[in-house]
């Protein structure tokens, strides 16, 4: 059994909301997020698969964590690559649940992570790149693995992508945090 705790902290690390449990924790936080707020998942076990929902509008992310995870609530330009519903309002439902063995071994998209962040965190899969157009969030590498597939435009959600700034040497790295076995790469969408 893993002891899990979810916390919402303000910019000064003061606790706004907190909940804990064994193998599952959920948290209803009645707070309007402010710049600098972050969501923290703490666990007494490392290197585990969990279902993590940092916001009900973002949905469930099946992730592999190697340590405690801090998710910084995005504001301003960092929000335009996300649904306008994400992190809005004053009532938020978050949860984390340790994955069962059958969920870990089932055939699935190993790269999907709607909760990936632009910064390095101990939460995988995680996408990084050597270039992202103008450093804008709508062109961040994480957009390639968030599950949003709208591609008939670009500039703001849902039309976000990995932008290579027309560079021939553009490269993306997808880190799984552990060795994985894959037999397919990608799915084209029109």
At which residue positions do the language-model features occur?
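Disordered, acidic Ser/Thr/Pro-rich linker "stalks" and the adjacent N-terminal cap
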Residues: 1-38, 43, 47-175
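Extended extracellular/luminal ectodomain segments enriched in beta-structured repeat modules
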Residues: 167-169, 177-186
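Conserved small/polar residues in nucleotide/adenosyl-binding loops
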Residues: 188-190
């Amino acid at each position: 059994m893993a002891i899990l705790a979810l916390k919402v902290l303000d910019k000064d690390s003061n606790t706004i909301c907190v909940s804990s449990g064994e193998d599952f924790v959920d948290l209803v936080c009645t707070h309007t997020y402010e710049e600098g707020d972050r969501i923290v998942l703490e666990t007494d076990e490392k290197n585990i698969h969990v279902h993590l929902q940092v916001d009900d509008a973002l949905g469930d992310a099946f992730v592999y964590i190697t340590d405690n995870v801090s998710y910084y609530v995005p504001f301003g330009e960092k929000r335009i690559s996300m649904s306008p519903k994400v992190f809005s309002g004053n009532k938020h439902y978050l949860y984390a649940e340790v994955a069962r063995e059958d969920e870990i071994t089932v055939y699935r998209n190993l790269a999907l992570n709607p909760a990936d962040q632009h910064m390095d965190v101990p939460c995988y899969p995680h996408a990084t790149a050597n270039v992202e157009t103008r450093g804008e969030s709508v062109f961040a590498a994480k957009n390639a693995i968030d599950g949003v597939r709208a591609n008939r435009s670009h500039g703001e959600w849902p039309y976000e992508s990995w932008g290579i700034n027309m560079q021939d040497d553009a490269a993306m790295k997808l880190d799984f945090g552990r060795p994985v076995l894959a037999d397919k790469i990608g799915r084209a969408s029109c």
